[in-house]
Amino acid sequence: VARGANSFLEAMPQNQHLSLLWVGDSQDFRTRYFEKHFQIGLNIRELEIYFCENGVKVPHSFCFDDRTPAFAEAWYLVELLHRDLDQSKFSTSLPFDSPFMLMGDTQDHNASLYNHELEALHACLLKSVRLFQRIPSLLTPIKSLLHQPNKIALEPETFTLEYTAFSSVTTGQKIIVGFSAGDHLRPKPFYFIKDINQNFRPKNRGLDYRP
């Protein structure tokens, strides 16, 4: 999904063009709109991606079980062709390093082997979404300071769910409340708060370990 977004959306500071926004009505994550009315959606529970047109999921989705990354790339190209979108724009490159991502046509995604893990991950994300949705009401006394509109986004680079609780156009400062399912330093799920500004650099993330 991040590759599709990176192929068709203009780059934004801190790779915000890659953010997958939570859509409450459909209970899924979607890219920002590109080429006026297209999005790419993600259903984590089923490990399924699909195109959306004018906010509506369309048929011919792609499920990752027993399919290679090369198969996924071919699916993208076919779907782009069906929508008269420029296939030459699609690229597998990303603006960040991802050394453990599957590539090529030699290894299948075995989503069904991780059914319990996907179910647990989906449940954790849903619970966190509900918690983040309560933040505006909890911070009513300082509502004028809150970032509007309030977006909940899944960040592909860190695979963290993030909510911008405060944003300053003047200074570029942002205070973000987030949830992580775990990483190589902290294997268990955890919540975090990070403070970033315009000088934020991807290799100096707020979640980096500092002994």
Tell me the role of every PLM-derived stretch:
Residues 20, 32-44, 170-184:
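Broad, structure-driven detector of short, well-ordered beta-strand segments within folded domains
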Residues 1-39:
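N-terminal ordered "arm"
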Residues 30-67:
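Cofactor- and metal-binding active-site motifs of prokaryotic enzymes
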